[in-house]
């Protein structure tokens, strides 16, 4: 599913260097669930996302819910957080441009390539993704409050330092302190553009994203995304 900062295109490369086989796999920043949906062979999979509406949406999809078409009027109402949590989550992500939380209504649009029904595309992708999320446990809390079993493989895709476009500011310094503590009893991997000296770079990938390392959002920006291990 399209989601701002999604790892859909990078999941295969990242999983090549993380041995998840037989491990408890935990994602504190699961977002659009594209990464965890690609994880195979883990003992268990747990997805945490602080946005409760997104979590409610995925829980509903995994349970067999088929989202309805969202009109502009629906979108405006749901944007005010009036409605069922899972429907708000669907409108906020799947019915918004580039998967940005209520970043503009996406419906049927005339493009240079022809007519595109963005909601239909999102629905088809979501139903396929829901099949790959069977067996995943979900939670919605701050990463610091997440209970992580000892020995887990923890993959973190936090909001990147110096980027814009996310709903709230993110304290990257506090996050890295938490990651260092967590690495005492787990294998911790972090996707970022840069990291403190105590993290080891193990993968470097050129990407194009709507969030660039120079802090500018919007459009397509070329960046080098890295994977670090603690």
Predicted ranges, named:
Residues 41-139, 144-145:
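Class I S-adenosyl-L-methionine-dependent methyltransferase module
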């Amino acid at each position: 599913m399209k989601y701002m900062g999604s790892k859909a295109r990078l999941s295969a490369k990242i999983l090549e260097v993380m041995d998840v086989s037989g491990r408890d796999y935990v994602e504190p920043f699961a977002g659009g669930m594209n990464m965890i949906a690609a994880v195979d062979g883990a003992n268990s999979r747990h997805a945490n996302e602080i946005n409760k509406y997104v979590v409610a949406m995925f829980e509903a999809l995994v349970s067999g819910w088929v989202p309805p078409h969202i009109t502009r009027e629906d979108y405006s109402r749901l944007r005010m957080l009036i409605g069922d949590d899972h429907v708000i989550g669907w409108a906020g992500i799947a019915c918004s441009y580039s998967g940005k939380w209520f970043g503009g209504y996406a419906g049927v649009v005339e493009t240079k390539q022809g007519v595109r029904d963005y909601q239909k595309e999102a629905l088809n992708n979501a139903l396929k993704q829901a099949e790959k999320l069977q067996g995943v446990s979900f939670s919605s809390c701050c990463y610091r409050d997440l209970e992580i079993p000892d020995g887990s493989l923890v993959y973190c895709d936090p909001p990147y330092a110096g980027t814009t476009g996310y709903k709230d500011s993110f304290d990257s310094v506090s996050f890295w302190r938490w990651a260092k503590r967590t690495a005492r009893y787990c294998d911790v991997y972090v996707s970022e553009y840069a990291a403190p000296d105590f993290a080891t770079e193990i993968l470097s990938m050129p990407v194009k994203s709507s969030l660039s390392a120079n802090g500018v959002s919007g459009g397509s920006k070329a960046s080098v995304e890295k994977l670090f291990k603690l």
